[in-house]
């Protein structure tokens, strides 16, 4: 797999975000666990890869050769055309360690029986997305969590205010069903960071009898790649689950930083507040933890800073 492009530089790390809903037997998962861990160690990769009977989900960071080696090993056991991959670049390593884990689900909704490889909504490519969401008959739904939505979203999107993806089915039954009934001609358009949550969310909706369900192919990250900022309907930055915290429309690290105490994204203004202590507390968690917790957080921050200076 050739992942070189014009941005390739000896000073940049390559970040690959990928997933595939591909049914695997246990023997394949066992082999992949061993092979991917070995490749990660060999190429000094960092990141996380989740494997389950329903497929694979991961984000890894490292050299172009290392990232290519791991992806090529994965593709040997994937069905061609069912691998969603996005590449970006960062001047610093985006992760602190490398993990390959066996999970019940590659994205956790907590419901058995869903199969996005067989039942899924209508894919909408990035260059067609604006037309869909500009239509007043479209119900635009953000399937991400509320702390992700807080730093960026598509204009006019509905925020289900979920804390985790497991909360989404309850919101569908308590809120979305009545919204659709009140708007009989409605089309549903859903989006998430890279597309994986929408695959499962649209599969769930269809299983529950919803129709005219669409989702953004490749998610927000693909939209950033393919739609110019001047034509974009996106507002803000896109939260990502690594040390970059958030990406701007150029797929470069944005202005947000992470509070390592509570995990919330912070603006420069948040970091300038008197209550902020790096790695220990922020405005979101200033009253949330005990003194013992603060001491532990401070020691962890000291160790992180010491490690980064090596």
Curated annotation (Swiss-Prot):
The answer to keyword Oxidoreductase applying to this record is yes
**UniProt xrefs under InterPro entries:** Rhodanese-like_dom (IPR001763), Rhodanese-like_dom_sf (IPR036873), TrhO (IPR020936), TRHO_N (IPR040503)
Q: Which reaction does it catalyse?
A: uridine(34) in tRNA + AH2 + O2 = 5-hydroxyuridine(34) in tRNA + A + H2O
List the GO biological process terms.
Answer: tRNA modification
User: Keywords of this protein's UniProt record, alphabetized?
Assistant: Oxidoreductase, tRNA processing
Would the keyword tRNA processing be found if you checked this record's keyword annotation? yes
Q: Which residues form the active site?
A: 192 (cysteine persulfide intermediate)
Query: Under which EC number(s) is this enzyme classified?
Result: 1.14.-.-
Protein name, please?
tRNA uridine(34) hydroxylase
For the protein in the UniProt heading, the enzyme class is: oxidoreductase
Q: What gene does this protein come from?
A: trhO
Q: What does this protein do?
A: Catalyzes oxygen-dependent 5-hydroxyuridine (ho5U) modification at position 34 in tRNAs.
């Amino acid at each position: 797999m050739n992942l070189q492009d014009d941005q390739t530089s000896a000073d940049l790390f390559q970040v690959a975000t990928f997933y595939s809903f591909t049914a695997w037997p246990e023997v394949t998962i066992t082999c992949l666990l061993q092979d991917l861990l070995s490749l990660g160690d060999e190429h000094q990769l960092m990141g996380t890869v989740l494997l389950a009977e329903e497929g694979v989900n991961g984000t890894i960071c490292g050299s172009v050769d290392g990232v290519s080696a791991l992806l090529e090993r994965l593709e040997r056991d994937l069905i061609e055309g069912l691998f969603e991959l996005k590449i970006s670049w960062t001047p610093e390593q985006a992760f602190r360690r490398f993990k390959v884990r066996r999970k019940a689900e590659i994205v956790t909704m907590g419901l058995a029986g869903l199969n996005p490889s067989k039942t899924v909504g209508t894919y909408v490519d990035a260059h067609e997305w604006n037309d869909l969401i500009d239509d007043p008959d479209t119900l635009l739904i953000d399937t991400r969590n509320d702390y992700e939505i807080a730093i960026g979203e598509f204009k006019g999107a509905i925020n289900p205010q979920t804390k985790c993806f497991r909360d989404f089915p309850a919101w569908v039954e308590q809120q979305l069903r009545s919204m659709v009934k009140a708007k009989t001609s409605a089309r549903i358009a859903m989006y998430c960071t890279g597309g994986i949550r929408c695959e499962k969310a649209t599969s769930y909706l269809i299983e529950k009898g919803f129709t005219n369900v669409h989702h953004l192919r490749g998610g927000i990250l693909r939209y950033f790649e393919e739609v110019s900022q001047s034509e974009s309907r996106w507002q803000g930055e896109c939260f990502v689950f690594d040390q970059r915290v958030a990406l701007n429309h150029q797929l470069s690290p944005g202005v947000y930083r992470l509070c390592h105490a509570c995990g919330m994204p912070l603006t420069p203004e948040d970091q300038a507040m008197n209550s902020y202590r790096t790695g220990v507390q922020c405005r979101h968690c200033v009253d949330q933890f005990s003194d013992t917790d603060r001491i532990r957080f401070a020691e962890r921050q000291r160790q992180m800073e010491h490690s980064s200076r090596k």
